[in-house]
Amino acid sequence: MQGWINLNPWWKWRKKKKISADIWQGDILQTRLKEYDVIILSLVLQFIRPLDRESVLHKIYNSLPVGGKIILFEKIRYEDQVLDRKVIDMYYRFKEKNGYTKTSIYKKREALENVLIPYTVEENKELLKRAHFKKIEEIYRYLNFALIIAER
């Protein structure tokens, strides 16, 4: 997977405010984590094999101090399959309204089939619990995306 994000404005703001932050890219299963106060996983866990997700969260838990936070932003699915289908259709309509063609939406969906494996919010919360996180809260949801915060 390749991607590029222009973080220059953020880096300038961070430097001005004297905020210490690391951004890294790599295989989280192979990366040694140092201690962080907050770790943000944005659209990451959904691409990790389901069998490896709990060990990734344990690894993150162990790299946080007591009171440290994980912020998890993920594409989700709904338990109710009818609702899930409706929300996905709403998401595709949203993408069309924002300039995506039906063909590009279809091609991306096909490319991500069996690669992006979303969980329900409850399944993600359960994974966090099994990794020993506490105070697990869903704090934002839009269509089939959710933001969850948890504390070590």
Where in this protein do the model-derived segments appear?
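A short acidic, Gly/Pro-enriched loop at the edge of an enzyme's catalytic core
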Residues: 29-39
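Residues lining the SAM
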Residues: 41-45, 73
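Hydrophobic beta-strand segment of the Class I
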Residues: 39-40, 128
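Core SAM-dependent methyltransferase catalytic element
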Residues: 125-152
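Class I SAM-dependent methyltransferase SAM/SAH-binding core
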Residues: 1-31
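Conserved beta-strand signature within the Rossmann-like core of class I S-adenosyl-L-methionine
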Residues: 64-75
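C-terminal alpha-helical "lid/dimerization" subdomain adjacent to the S-adenosyl-L-methionine
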Residues: 75-131
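A short glycine-rich, Lys/Arg-flanked "PGG" loop and its adjoining helix->strand segment in the class I
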Residues: 54-66
